[in-house]
């Protein structure tokens, strides 16, 4: 397998005085290039915590995370930030679009952070918005877009840098069933056409069943789910 992201014996413990809570313990995972998978589990099972660790947004108390063969624990915060910006995309339940900027300007942002020429950044952002079906909404601000359109814009922003892996935390959680299905299919389509690996945390078991692998997080441990029933 051509690994994009992996973790070994990953653990996360929260300490509050004498009370210790192990949220994750001994988690192993390998994600190949272009693979798409879902992580399911009960509320509070640590799904979001795992995604934050995989994305280098939080630090594990045990184990290692590697992105494109680079051990995150051996990188400085600046180096981790650079790796995230260059190799990873993030989509959340809430779109986190900046309300004062247009859809085009929001999607341009990661490219401008890379110090890309403004004209080229605008061209690439417009192209990605076209791919997600928002070619006619470039100059609309988030408040002028529907919930599904805002999430499509967030997906475009996450993918405009052509990351190796996209981490999505309940990306359809705020959408109605029909719109959620459309947005989920859009992510799978972009996974196929762009070759970006995709890890989706979701509580929607029907949507999870559309991915190549479904993993269940239970009592801090990750295992292949034989079924996507609750």
Curated annotation (Swiss-Prot):
Instruction: Tell me which SMART domains the record gives.
Output: AAA (SM00382)
User: Where located?
Assistant: Cell inner membrane
Q: Name one GO biological process term.
A: protein localization to outer membrane
The molecular function terms in GO held by this entry are: ATP binding; ATP hydrolysis activity; transmembrane transporter activity
Keyword RNA-binding recorded: no
Q: Where does ATP bind?
A: 41-48
Q: Which family does it belong to?
A: Belongs to the ABC transporter superfamily. Lipoprotein translocase (TC 3.A.1.125) family.
Q: How does it assemble?
A: The complex is composed of two ATP-binding proteins (LolD) and two transmembrane proteins (LolC and LolE).
Protein name per UniProt = Lipoprotein-releasing system ATP-binding protein LolD
């Amino acid at each position: 397998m051509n690994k994009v992201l992996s973790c070994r014996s990953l653990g996360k413990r929260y300490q509050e005085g004498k009370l210790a809570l192990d949220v994750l313990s001994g988690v192993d995972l390998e994600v190949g290039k272009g693979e798409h998978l879902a992580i399911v589990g009960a509320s509070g099972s640590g799904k979001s915590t795992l995604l934050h660790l995989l994305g280098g947004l939080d630090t594990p108390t045990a184990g290692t995370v590697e992105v494109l063969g680079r051990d995150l624990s051996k990188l400085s915060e600046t180096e981790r930030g650079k790796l995230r910006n260059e190799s990873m995309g993030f989509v959340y339940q809430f779109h986190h679009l900046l309300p004062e900027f247009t859809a085009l300007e929001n999607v341009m942002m990661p490219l401008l952070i890379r110090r890309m020429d403004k004209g080229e950044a605008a061209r690439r952002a417009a192209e990605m918005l076209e791919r997600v079906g928002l070619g006619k909404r470039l100059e609309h601000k988030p408040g002028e877009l529907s919930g599904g359109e805002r999430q499509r814009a967030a997906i475009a922003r996450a993918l405009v840098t052509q990351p190796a892996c996209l981490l999505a935390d309940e990306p359809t959680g705020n959408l109605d069933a029909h719109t959620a299905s459309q947005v989920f299919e859009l992510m799978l389509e972009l996974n196929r056409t762009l070759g970006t690996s995709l890890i989706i945390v979701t509580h929607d078991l029907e949507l999870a069943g559309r991915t190549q692998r479904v993993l269940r997080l239970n009592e801090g441990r990750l295992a292949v789910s034989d079924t996507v029933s609750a």
